[in-house]
């Protein structure tokens, strides 16, 4: 089902599905029991633009920590549960806004019913998570290996288990580290369910490889009109996940706001440290709430012309640089003042 037509689900004070904006999610990578570290990381993620946060709940101490964590953050809190149904119940009792479980490994029908009963009482959505790495043996044998068909069949089977308990406040996530398999599976699943989908490429890798895999996979899936929440899974600081997710959504026209920085690839004419300058500009504009394009160009020869599509830009020279607006040179400034001049222009943009 395309995102405009998926079932509307409330997660804390946020709403997904039914054509609502695609929300950005991440997951903490510090022990949930360490409340101070967990809250500090979540607040950093919030500042970067994270809209839903997931924490692992492997034990009772972690479940109890959720209550204190929730008091100090400002976005919905999702509990990630593996195997132990008691942790799912404890997480909900301690304020989780959503739980993520695999109904197939929670301990049987009776225990699943106990989890669903609490979710129903508190109106807490359940995210059904299926990963290609843990696909059931019978489905691997049925389809001759790990396949998109097997992943989708597994997910729908798990959804039915919850529906049979009389509950339909459900979000589905299916993940694979194989990008094309993940794309195929999401296209298949979207045609078979009305539930909103959380989209991500699992085990995607480091910042470099993970960004490439996620950009391709999420880009295709989202462009097809599929997906209600996303996560760019990276091995590293989760704040990097948020930066990447925002850029993916902006590139696809699914998110407005925030300055887009473009820069030239450099050539032999470049007379300034363009790589360093571009990185400085990107960091500098991160907290400026403008919906414009900024160009950072390496020379005065092609810089103005190539920056025509940008709202404003700078181009380097020998000891000096140019301030450009819509391809027109506005003024020359010393190289040492380029960054400050650009920032001043941006801060006074609407004046």
Indicate where each model-derived feature is located.
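Active-site mouth loops of central-metabolism enzymes
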Residues: 19-37, 56, 75-83, 139-152, ...
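Hydrophobic faces of well-ordered beta-strands that scaffold small-molecule active sites
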Residues: 22-28, 53-55, 77-81, 99-101, ...
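Glycine-enriched alpha-helix->loop->beta-strand junction motifs that scaffold or abut catalytic
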Residues: 72-75, 92-99, 120-123, 190-196, ...
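N-terminal amphipathic alpha-helix/helix-capping segment at the start of soluble metabolic enzymes
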Residues: 1-26, 120, 283
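Alpha-helix-loop-beta-strand connector modules within alpha/beta enzyme cores
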Residues: 60-81, 114-126, 186-197, 281-283
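Hydrophobic or amphipathic alpha-helical targeting/insertion segments
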Residues: 86-127
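Glycine-rich, proline-tolerant flexible connector loops at the mouths of alpha/beta enzymes
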Residues: 29, 34-35, 46-69, 100-108, ...
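Catalytic alpha/beta core domains of metabolic enzymes, predominantly
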Residues: 131, 139-286
């Amino acid at each position: 089902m395309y995102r405009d037509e998926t079932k509307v689900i409330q997660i804390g004070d946020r709403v997904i599905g039914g054509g609502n904006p695609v929300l950005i999610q991440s997951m903490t990578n510090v022990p949930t029991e360490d409340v101070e570290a967990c809250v500090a990381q979540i607040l950093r993620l919030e500042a970067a633009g994270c809209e839903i946060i997931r924490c692992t709940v492997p034990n009772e101490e972690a479940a109890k920590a959720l209550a204190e964590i929730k008091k100090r953050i400002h976005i919905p809190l999702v509990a990630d549960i593996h195997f132990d149904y008691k942790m799912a119940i404890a997480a909900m009792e301690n304020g989780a806004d959503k739980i993520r479980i695999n109904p197939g490994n929670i301990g049987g029908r009776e225990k699943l019913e106990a989890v669903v009963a609490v979710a129903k009482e508190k109106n807490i959505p359940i995210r059904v998570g299926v990963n290609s790495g843990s696909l059931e043996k019978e489905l691997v044998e049925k389809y001759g290996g790990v396949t998109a068909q097997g992943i989708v069949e597994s997910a729908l089977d798990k959804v039915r288990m919850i529906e049979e308990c009389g509950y339909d406040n459900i979000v589905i996530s299916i993940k694979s580290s194989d990008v094309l398999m993940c794309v195929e599976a999401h296209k298949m699943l979207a045609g078979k369910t009305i539930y909103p989908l959380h989209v991500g490429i699992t085990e995607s890798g480091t910042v470099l490889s993970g960004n490439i895999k996620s950009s391709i996979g999420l880009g295709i899936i989202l462009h097809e009109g599929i997906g209600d929440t996303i996560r760019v899974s990276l091995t590293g600081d989760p704040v990097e996940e948020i930066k990447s997710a925002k850029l993916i959504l902006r590139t696809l026209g699914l998110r407005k706001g925030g300055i887009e920085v473009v820069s030239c690839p450099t050539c032999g004419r470049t007379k300034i440290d363009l790589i360093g300058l571009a990185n400085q500009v990107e960091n500098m504009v991160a907290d400026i709430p403008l919906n414009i394009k900024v160009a950072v160009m390496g020379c005065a020869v092609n810089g103005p012309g190539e920056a025509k599509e940008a709202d404003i830009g700078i181009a380097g020279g020998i000891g000096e640089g140019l301030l450009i607006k819509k391809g027109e040179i506005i003024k020359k400034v010393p190289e040492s003042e380029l960054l400050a001049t650009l920032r001043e222009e941006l801060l006074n943009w609407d004046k």
